[in-house]
C-alpha cells in the first residue's frame, strides 16, 4: 500500500513532454516524436511549465540569453523566476514572483502568461519590449501586490483590471503608450505607489469617490496630457503623500488652497502647466516640503512672504521661474541669496533676467478670466500657523497687478 502511495505522489509531480532536441510547438501545446518524463517539485510548477515554454516561443529578442536557462524541470532556477511557499500552505512550492527588470526581452504580448500564475505576488518587467494590453484576467491573481510594467510598449486604456484588486499596493505603468482617462476608483484604492507618468493620458483628473480617503505615498502623473483643474478632493485627502509630481500636463485654473493639506509631502512639482492666479497662502502649512516647483505656469502676484518665512529652514528649492510674479519681499530675497528661490523670467521690477515690459503688459491687460474666483480662498489656511490672521497676511500678498 505504501509503495502505491509513493508512486501516486510521484506521478502528480510529473509531466510528459517532448525531448528538447525534437520538440515542436503547436496551438495544441508541445508535441514531438520522443518524449521524456520531467519530475517537478510541486504540481504547481508542473502546471506553469508549459505556460513558460509557450511564452518563450513568443520572445523575438533576448540579448542576454535569459531564456536559455528556461529548460528542464527546475523552474525555480530559471532566470527571472523566484519560488516560495504560497500563503496558507507552507509545504507547497510555487512561482511567487517574476522579475524581468532590464532583460530587454521582446514579445508582442504578455496575454496568457502573467495571468496563468495563480500564486504570483510580484510581477516586475520594467525596461523590456513587451506590447499589447494588460490581460484582464490578472484580476484573478489574488496574491498580487506589486505590478511594475514600466518602460515597455503597452497600449490601450488604463488597465482597469487592477481596479478593485485589494491586495495591490504598488502600480508602476510609466513610460508606455496608455491613453484615455483614469478610473476614479484607482485614486481611492489602498495603494502606496501609483506611477502613471510618461504616457498619453488625457481628460481631467476625477474626484476621489466614496469618503475621499487614500493612503497613497507616491503619486506621479507627470508628462501626460491631463487637463482641467486640480481636483480639490485629491489634495484634501492625500495627507499621506510624500511626493506629488504633476508636472508637464495641461492643468488649468488656480492652485486650490487645499494644497496646504499635503502636510506629509517633501516634493511637490506642478511645473509646466497652465495654472494661473496667486500662490495660495496655505503653502506655508507644508512643514516637511523641501522642493516646490511651480515654474512654467501663468501665476502672478507677489511671492508670499509668509511662505518664504515659515518654510525657509527646510526648503532646498522653490522654483517660480517663467511665470508673471511682480513682487519679492525681504524674506523671499533671503532665499534668493541662498540660491533656494528662482524667480527668473517673471515681471519683477528692477530684477535681472525678467520678461520684457511689453510681454508683462500684454499679460496683465488680458480679461479678468485670468483671475481666480473666490480670491479670498487664497488667504485661507488651516495649520498650526493660525496666529497669522488672514487680514495681516494680505500684506504679504497683494492681489492687484501693477499698471503696465
UniProtKB/Swiss-Prot annotation:
Q: Where are the LRR repeats?
A: 117-141, 142-165, 167-188, 189-212, 214-237, 239-262, 263-286, 287-310, 312-338, 340-359
Specify the signal sequence span: 1-16
SUPFAM superfamilies to which the protein is assigned, alphabetical: L domain-like (SSF52058)
Kindly report the protein's main subcellular placement as a broad class.
secreted
Which Pfam families does this entry report, sorted A to Z?
A: LRR_1 (PF00560)
- Fetch the InterPro entries from UniProt: Leu-rich_rpt, LRR_dom_sf, LRR_extensin-like_regulator
Top-level taxon: Eukaryota
Keyword annotations of the record: Leucine-rich repeat, Repeat, Secreted, Signal
Identify the GO cellular component terms for this protein: extracellular region
Cellular location(s): Secreted
PANTHER family noted in UniProt = LEUCINE-RICH REPEAT EXTENSIN-LIKE PROTEIN 3-RELATED, LEUCINE-RICH REPEAT-CONTAINING N-TERMINAL PLANT-TYPE DOMAIN-CONTAINING PROTEIN
Q: What is this protein called?
A: Uncharacterized protein At4g06744
Q: Which organism is it from?
A: Arabidopsis thaliana (Mouse-ear cress)
Source organism phylogeny:
Eukaryota, Viridiplantae, Streptophyta, Embryophyta, Tracheophyta
Amino acid at each position: 500500500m505504501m509503495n502505491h502511495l509513493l508512486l501516486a505522489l510521484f506521478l502528480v509531480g510529473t509531466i510528459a513532454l517532448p525531448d528538447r532536441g525534437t520538440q515542436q510547438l503547436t496551438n495544441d501545446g508541445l508535441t514531438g516524436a520522443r518524449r521524456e518524463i520531467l519530475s517537478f517539485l510541486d504540481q504547481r510548477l508542473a502546471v506553469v511549465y508549459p505556460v513558460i515554454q509557450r511564452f518563450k516561443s513568443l520572445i523575438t529578442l533576448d540579448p542576454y540569453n535569459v531564456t536559455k536557462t528556461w529548460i528542464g524541470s527546475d523552474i525555480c532556477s530559471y532566470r527571472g523566476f523566484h519560488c516560495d511557499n504560497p500563503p496558507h500552505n507552507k509545504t507547497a512550492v510555487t512561482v511567487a514572483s517574476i522579475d524581468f527588470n532590464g532583460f530587454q526581452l521582446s514579445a508582442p504580448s504578455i496575454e496568457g502568461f502573467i495571468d496563468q500564475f495563480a500564486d504570483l505576488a510580484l510581477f516586475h518587467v520594467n525596461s523590456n519590449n513587451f506590447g499589447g494590453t494588460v490581460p484582464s484576467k490578472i484580476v484573478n491573481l489574488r496574491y498580487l501586490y506589486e505590478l511594475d510594467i514600466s518602460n515597455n510598449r503597452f497600449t490601450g486604456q488604463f488597465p482597469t483590471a487592477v481596479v478593485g484588486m485589494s491586495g495591490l499596493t504598488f502600480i508602476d505603468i510609466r513610460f508606455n503608450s496608455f491613453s484615455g482617462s483614469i478610473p476614479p476608483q484607482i485614486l481611492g484604492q489602498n495603494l502606496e505607489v501609483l506611477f502613471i507618468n510618461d504616457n498619453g493620458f488625457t481628460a481631467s483628473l476625477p474626484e476621489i469617490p466614496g469618503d475621499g480617503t487614500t493612503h497613497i505615498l507616491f503619486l506621479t502623473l507627470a508628462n501626460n496630457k491631463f487637463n482641467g483643474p486640480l481636483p480639490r478632493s485629491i489634495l484634501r485627502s492625500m495627507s499621506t503623500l510624500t511626493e506629488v509630481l504633476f508636472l508637464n500636463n495641461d492643468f488649468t485654473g488656480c492652485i486650490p488652497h487645499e494644497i496646504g493639506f499635503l502636510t506629509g509631502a517633501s516634493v511637490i512639482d506642478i511645473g509646466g502647466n497652465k495654472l494661473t492666479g496667486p500662490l495660495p497662502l496655505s503653502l506655508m502649512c507644508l512643514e516637511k516640503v523641501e522642493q516646490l516647483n511651480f515654474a512654467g505656469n501663468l501665476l502672478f502676484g507677489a511671492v508670499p512672504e509668509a511662505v518664504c518665512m515659515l518654510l525657509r529652514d527646510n526648503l532646498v528649492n522653490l522654483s517660480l521661474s517663467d511665470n508673471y510674479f511682480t513682487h519679492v519681499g525681504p524674506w523671499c530675497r533671503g532665499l534668493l541669496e541662498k540660491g533656494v528661490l528662482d524667480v527668473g523670467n517673471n515681471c519683477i521690477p528692477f530684477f535681472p533676467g525678467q520678461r520684457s515690459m511689453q510681454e508683462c503688459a500684454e499679460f496683465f491687460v488680458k480679461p479678468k478670466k485670468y483671475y481666480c474666483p473666490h480670491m479670498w480662498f487664497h488667504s485661507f489656511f488651516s495649520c498650526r500657523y493660525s496666529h497669522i490672521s488672514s487680514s495681516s497676511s494680505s500684506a504679504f500678498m497683494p492681489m492687484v497687478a501693477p499698471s503696465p
